[in-house]
């Protein structure tokens, strides 16, 4: 039996993907049956981080070592991730949500529709306020764009109003939000988005 929703979480290295997955697990685990697949190039660092953080029981977390280019494992040949998801769905037949966190990649990374139903794309303010206008599938076509680390804006000279204007121009009506996952600012919008996507929500 498959889970009700498979959610991809993608974005550049250090943008806050694992922090978002952890926050979603902690917020949703008491009301939903959850599991996570993480992707790293040569390690299982993100899976180990989630386990140490107590985000979920260890058996609900699978770490995939992609080798080479991380985008290949979520797009062109996602068989290793599909197998990990299928394994979790076999072990936990009542899963509501499986999150698949990609390895850190560039703005062109996107998930295969064979792997996930929806994608959240995470960027961070520390990379500069020009990132939204650079475009790419994650910026323009993700189901939800999360602009993380807003607390760093004054430290890196990023203008959040510029980021907001560029994001609205690049995304049109597609949803997006600002977050600071260190203190939970904006997390409620991400949680509400996820809950709204579940069947029979």
UniProtKB/Swiss-Prot annotation:
- Residues binding GTP: 11-18
Q: Where in the cell is it found?
A: Cytoplasm
The UniProt entry, under Gene3D superfamilies, shows:
P-loop containing nucleotide triphosphate hydrolases
Any one Gene Ontology molecular-function term assigned to this protein's record: GTP binding
A GO biological process of this protein is: urea catabolic process
Query: Sorted alphabetically, which Pfam families does this protein's record hold?
Result: cobW (PF02492)
- Keyword set for this entry? Chaperone, Cytoplasm, GTP-binding, Nickel insertion, Nucleotide-binding
Entry's InterPro entries?
A: CobW/HypB/UreG_nucleotide-bd, P-loop_NTPase, UreG
| Broad class of where this protein is predominantly found | cytoplasm
What do the Gene Ontology cellular component annotations say?
cytoplasm
Presence of the UniProt keyword Ribosomal protein in the record: no
Domain of life of the native organism: Bacteria
Tell me its family. Belongs to the SIMIBI class G3E GTPase family. UreG subfamily.
Q: How does it assemble?
A: Homodimer. UreD, UreF and UreG form a complex that acts as a GTP-hydrolysis-dependent molecular chaperone, activating the urease apoprotein by helping to assemble the nickel containing metallocenter of UreC. The UreE protein probably delivers the nickel.
Biological function? Facilitates the functional incorporation of the urease nickel metallocenter. This process requires GTP hydrolysis, probably effectuated by UreG.
Provide the protein name: Urease accessory protein UreG
Source gene? ureG
């Amino acid at each position: 039996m498959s889970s009700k929703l498979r959610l991809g979480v993608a974005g550049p290295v250090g943008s806050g993907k694992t922090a978002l997955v952890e926050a979603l697990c902690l917020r949703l685990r008491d009301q939903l049956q959850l599991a996570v697949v993480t992707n790293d190039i040569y390690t299982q660092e993100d899976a180990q981080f989630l386990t140490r953080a107590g985000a979920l029981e260890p058996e609900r977390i699978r770490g995939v070592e992609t080798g080479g280019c991380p985008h290949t494992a979520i797009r062109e040949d996602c068989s290793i991730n599909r197998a990990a998801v299928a394994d979790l769905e076999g072990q936990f037949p009542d899963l509501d949500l499986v999150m698949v966190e990609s390895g850190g990649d560039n703005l062109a990374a996107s998930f295969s529709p064979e792997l996930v139903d929806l994608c959240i794309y995470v960027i961070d303010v520390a990379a500069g306020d020009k990132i939204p206008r650079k475009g790419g599938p994650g910026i323009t076509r993700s189901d939800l764009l999360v602009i993380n680390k807003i607390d760093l804006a004054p430290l890196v000279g990023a203008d959040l109003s510029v980021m907001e204007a560029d994001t609205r121009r690049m995304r049109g009506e597609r949803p997006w939000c600002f977050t600071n996952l260190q203190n939970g600012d904006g997390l409620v919008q991400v949680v509400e988005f996820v809950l709204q996507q579940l069947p029979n929500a």
